[in-house]
Amino acid sequence: MTFNNKTIDELHDLLVKKEISAVELTKATLEDIKSREGAVDAFLTITEDAALAQAAALDEKGIDADNVMAGIPLAVKDNISTKGILTTAASKMLYNYEPIFDATSVAQAYAKDMIIVGKTNMDEFAMGGSNENSAFKPTKNAWDQTKVPGGSSGGSAAAVASGQVRLSLGSDTGGSIRQPAAFNGIVGMKPTYGTVSRFGLIAFGSSLDQIGPFSQTVKENAQLLNVISGHDVKDATSTINEIADFTSKIGQDIKGMKIALPKEYMGEGIDPQVKETILKAAKHLESLGAIIEEVSLPHSKYGVAVYYIIASSEASSNLQRFDGIRYGFRAEDATNLDEIYVKTRSQGFGEEVKRRIMLGTFSLSSGYYDAYFKKAGQVRTLIIQDFEKVFADYDLILGPTAPTVAFGLDTLNHDPVAMYLADLLTIPVNLAGLPGLSIPAGFVEGLPVGLQLIGPKYSEETIYQVAAAFEATTDYHKQQPVIFGGAN
């Protein structure tokens, strides 16, 4: 028996009516995970015993009819801390690390009686766009197992797209939720910076990182964001997002809404078929009453360069804590303190992580700080100002989530610059701290294309409103890969 084709609302109705139990739903989910895992390799840890025990306790307590998330299984990216459950960030450096606390987002999920069924694969320390930088294994795309699932939250995206779970958590530093969502044909939201607490998220770029939800549908995405959002005193960058219910505008029409289409998002480097798909999506939104107009974000072309200086510099600082002394991997052949540091970090970090640490350390070093890190911060301000100018006249921005559909395994992982450029459409959103959502908008040669909707800070309600209107009048979200039982 499987329930992976039912929405959260439908599952909740079954649970409340006691037509299924939380244990039955959890067992069915675990079976879905096991039956598909060999094909997609989405999980690093499956928490079968703990999940079943949690579900049994919930059945004994009873399902609260007002708590739509009670008993719903959830997969969690492996850089989000889970008490007593391996949290490796897909790195040899943390191969045996079990946190003694839960991330705030995980604690919030537990508080709503969600059932955590496992930890998902990712690029090591969230550095990568293909999931091939995992120290343990590459995850495969749900639609075509010869393609990448995107990164860094590729495991979380593939788990939802393949029908292993309905919902998962990821993190997004430069596109790591939206790009995998696009590549796998599902919904992925990077909320406004500060909307979801970063407490318990293993830090990569502290001014950029944000936890967010993956789902099959727009409403389910908003429902999960309701769970994990909220101000947290444990996170100094946590903000108060006044939106009480992210689902509140879903179902409202979008007539008269002004949506901008930046010419830079449809120019050089964008696959012509992806561009055609997005223009078709824009026409569809026009047919629903939205007003689509071309605008310019002139400094977005510098986004990738700015991002890789700022993110790598922050990573260089954040990853200093992994030294072989306190926890995690320690080199066995070290004979003194200096060797412990050098050999542990040389052996424990993967090539991409070491590349970014070196890049960041260089950017912060004496004599180069002004030329690189300071200048990157100044251009970041210009990128923010570009967005502010557009949002003075428009409700949202739309464009492709990624310049191409999912590419083949072992094609870009030896070309770091090409891999970095794959994030050129998502990175500016992180630099500006804005919310961005990717939704399925079509297919190119059998692979999903993602439509990205970007709004001003704290506009998640409006983004979900437009996304839901698009979803309700198209069937892209209903199409499923073969592994999920679909015909594609």
From Swiss-Prot:
Keyword Protein biosynthesis: yes
Subunit structure, interactors included: Heterotrimer of A, B and C subunits.
Family that this chain belongs to: Belongs to the amidase family. GatA subfamily.
Reaction(s) this enzyme catalyzes, per UniProt: L-glutamyl-tRNA(Gln) + L-glutamine + ATP + H2O = L-glutaminyl-tRNA(Gln) + L-glutamate + ADP + phosphate + H(+)
Species whose genome carries this gene: Streptococcus suis (strain 05ZYH33)
Protein name: Glutamyl-tRNA(Gln) amidotransferase subunit A
Gene Ontology BP term (one): translation
GO molecular function: ATP binding; glutaminyl-tRNA synthase (glutamine-hydrolyzing) activity
EC number: 6.3.5.7
Domain of life of the native organism: Bacteria
NCBIfam families, per database record: gatA
Function: Allows the formation of correctly charged Gln-tRNA(Gln) through the transamidation of misacylated Glu-tRNA(Gln) in organisms which lack glutaminyl-tRNA synthetase. The reaction takes place in the presence of glutamine and ATP through an activated gamma-phospho-Glu-tRNA(Gln).
One protein family per Pfam: Amidase
Species classification: Bacteria, Bacillati, Bacillota, Bacilli, Lactobacillales
GO cellular component, one term: glutamyl-tRNA(Gln) amidotransferase complex
Keywords carried by this UniProt record: ATP-binding, Ligase, Nucleotide-binding, Protein biosynthesis
Active site per UniProt: K77 (charge relay system), S152 (charge relay system), S176 (acyl-ester intermediate)
